[in-house]
Amino acid sequence: MTRLTAALAFVMLSAAAQGADAPPGAASCSGCHAANPRVETPVPPLGGRPAAEIASQMAAFKSGERKGTIMDRIAKGFSEEETRAIAAWYEQQK
């Protein structure tokens, strides 16, 4: 129960920490990926990564070129414009 509580608190705090300037959809990423590149998460943090890299990886998941546990399904839910906006926002999170 303690792990579950800690995990839920982390997700809620991560989403809240993104602030109002985050584009729609960015909060869904923070459940697994941290916006802060100095936070350790089981999957790579997105904060500070080049936008082109993030967008490219999302496109690879979306097309099926890159396999993932759930990223292929998540990527399909975003348009190219949404993906670019999310990627640009995460690049600025340093």
Please annotate each region the language model reported.
Residues 36-66, 72, 76:
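Gly/Gly-Pro-rich "capping" loops immediately C-terminal to redox-active cysteine motifs
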Residues 22-25, 47-50, 79:
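Short, conserved glycine- and acidic-residue-centered signature motifs
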